[in-house]
Amino acid sequence: MWLLYLILGSVESQLLPGNNHTTECNIPGNFMCSNGRCIPGGWQCDGNPDCFDESDEKECPRARSRCGPNFFPCTSGIHCIIARFQCNGFEDCPDGSDEENCTAHPLLCSNSRFHCKNHLCIDKSFVCDGQNNCLDNSDEEHCHSPQEPGSEQDYVSSENQLLYYPSITYTIIGSSVIFVLVVALLALVLHHQRKRNLMSLPVHRLQHPLLLSRLVVLDHPHHCRVTYNVNNGIQYMSGQGYQQPVSVESPPSYTEAVLDHSSRPPWFDLPPPPYPSDMESVSQTELPPYRSRTGSSASAGSTEHPRGTPCGTESPTEPQDPTAAPSDDLPSTEVDV
């Protein structure tokens, strides 16, 4: 008989799960949930619900808080959240203790917070942010319309929305200052470079002789004649028909020529040649030859070019203007080029 009862009891304990849980819960140190499931006793009141009905986190003594003055301690005593997250419509604590008994604390729903229509309180920064923080969408109503007088809802002011504007302003000002400094430095470098170029110009100019300014470059044709006339300066005549003479820069004045000792030839200070006697001057019908400073003698008329020169065509001397001032009747010299 006793053997039969023992067999029936073992079969019943294996077929009925409730009895199995009861057997496990009889072990010292285990906790039985409200649905009959057993969990280790160390999981009870640890801040994490292990039972499906969360009965292991109910009626737990509040642990000693280790949070700072600006934080809210969760019921488990392990987690801490920012104080302003308490009663904001979201369960920030794992056990949801931050959203319990919110309406029972009038200080948590003071005028500094937003009152939802379902009697929840959230922070002002969550109003009109595009999210349903009140769980009834009351924090997203009338976001683009002006606030009605006497309404209990407070909306985020423009000052709260512009919290980050000072940093943006400082960034723009700093960028502008850096840009101005870079432009000023670039302008200073260009000015210094230009000043150096201007200072180096006179050095190159002094390296050339001073007489280069008196040089005349002539584009000689195949047949040409150049006439040097003291009164009219230098005249250029082409052999291919008479062209209008080109007036070139006149020779230097007498004072400049006398003072310019470097351009004097060696025979400049020699005495003049002897003049012929009166009888010889009467018998001669031609003027005495004129000796130029270069040492070559020429007659009063134009000098013929020797054969083989590129300019063999003679050109008459340009007639003088009768209205011009009287000169010393110095002869002109024609030199073939």
Swiss-Prot record:
It is found in: Cell membrane. Residues 24-61, 66-103, 108-144 form the LDL-receptor class A domain. It is a single-pass type I membrane protein. Gene3D superfamilies: Low-density Lipoprotein Receptor. Glycans are attached at N20, N101. GO terms for biological process: vesicle-mediated transport. Residues 291-303 have a biased composition (Low complexity). The chain crosses the membrane at residues 170-190. Residues 191-337 are cytoplasmic. Residues 14-169 are extracellular. One of its GO terms (cellular component) is plasma membrane. Disulfide bonds join C25-C38, C33-C51, C45-C60, C67-C80, C74-C93, C87-C102, C109-C121, C116-C134, C128-C143. PROSITE patterns: LDLRA_1 (PS01209), LDLRA_2 (PS50068). Keywords: Cell membrane, Disulfide bond, Glycoprotein, Lipoprotein, Membrane, Receptor, Repeat, Signal, Transmembrane, Transmembrane helix. Residues 1-13 form the signal peptide. Residues 243-253 have a biased composition (Polar residues). Residues 243-337 are annotated as: Disordered. Belongs to the LDLR family. PANTHER family: LOW-DENSITY LIPOPROTEIN RECEPTOR CLASS A DOMAIN-CONTAINING PROTEIN 3, LOW-DENSITY LIPOPROTEIN RECEPTOR-RELATED. This is Low-density lipoprotein receptor class A domain-containing protein 3. It comes from Xenopus tropicalis (Western clawed frog).
